[in-house]
A protein has these predicted regions:
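Generic hydrophobic/aromatic pocket-lining and core-packing "Φ" positions
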Residues: 25, 52, 78, 99, ...
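Conserved anion-binding
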Residues: 59, 67, 72-152, 221
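Glycine-rich phosphate-binding active-site loops on the catalytic face of alpha/beta enzymes
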Residues: 84-97, 140-152, 176-177, 182, ...
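Conserved N-terminal beta1-alpha1 strand-loop-helix module at the mouth
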Residues: 1-62, 69-72, 79-85, 138-139, ...
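N-terminal small/glycine-rich loop or linker at the start of catalytic domains
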Residues: 1-12, 52-60, 101-122, 156-165
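Charged helix-capping and loop-helix junction motifs
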Residues: 49, 124-132, 155-161, 209-214
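Catalytic cores of alpha/beta
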Residues: 71-83, 125-129, 159, 165-166, ...
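Hydrophobic faces of well-ordered beta-strands that scaffold small-molecule active sites
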Residues: 5-12, 36-38, 62-66, 88-91, ...
Length: 222
């Protein structure tokens, strides 16, 4: 895939990992998607480790997205990512302790920016403040950002466009990407990556799970 617009397939529905995640990945491992992940809840750790190991065996880049807002829970999520051998930790509210832990363990860290609350998450805050927050975290050495662009309570298109044009780091637009219209918007602003989870389970891109993955992959490559 190109340098940007990487599809991250999330084996999640309504911000929770589905129970049959392993089975779905097994069926779809030969799809065109190279980036795969899921959430920190509710699979037991041993099942998470088994699935990540199988993903890595199949040459995938792996993500754990942690939808937690306290330092303690965020750090627990980071520890889980390391224990599972994940490539990239997405989510958590930024804390220096999490950032330092990720650096020490060679885990790429892409925290949330802005005011993120609830589950499924929503994003609030002024666009300029969100961008300035990201710049501060970049100075502290984060790899990139988990931007909940389509969960934003303000001007979504302006946030996504302004954030990506102002931040020189990998940006993943995560959450609520559920139609070709949004894929076309993403093609225009060209983020490093985007996630799709629930929309695949709700058959928003027509076909089997694997067919939907390939439809999305091919659409953003056009």
């Amino acid at each position: 895939m190109d340098k940007n617009l990487n599809l991250i397939v999330m084996l999640t529905h309504n911000d929770k990992t589905v129970e049959n995640a392993y089975e779905i990945f097994y069926k779809c491992k030969n799809s065109k998607a190279k980036f795969w992940g899921f959430k920190e809840k509710p699979l037991p750790l041993d099942q998470m480790k088994k699935l990540y190991k199988y993903m890595k065996k199949n040459g995938k880049t792996t993500f754990l997205e942690v939808v937690e807002y306290t330092e303690k829970e965020g750090l627990e999520g980071a520890k889980t990512a390391v224990e599972c051998g994940c490539d990239i930790l997405m989510g958590t509210v930024f804390f220096d302790s999490i950032n330092e832990f990720c650096k020490k363990n060679n885990l790429k860290y892409m925290p949330f920016v802005g005011k993120v609350t609830k589950r499924p998450s929503i994003l609030e805050g002024e666009i300029e403040e969100i961008i300035n927050e990201a710049r501060l975290y970049l100075k502290k050495g984060v790899y990139g950002f988990d931007l909940l662009g389509y969960r934003y309570t303000g001007n979504i298109l302006k946030l996504n466009r302004d954030f990506i044009s102002n931040i020189n780091a990998p940006v993943c637009i995560a959450g609520s990407i559920n139609g070709y219209d949004k894929l076309d918007e993403l093609k225009n602003i060209n983020p490093w990556a985007f996630t799709i989870g629930s929309a695949f389970f709700e058959n928003k891109f027509d076909g089997t799970f694997e067919e939907q993955i390939n439809h999305v992959y091919e659409h953003v490559k056009k």
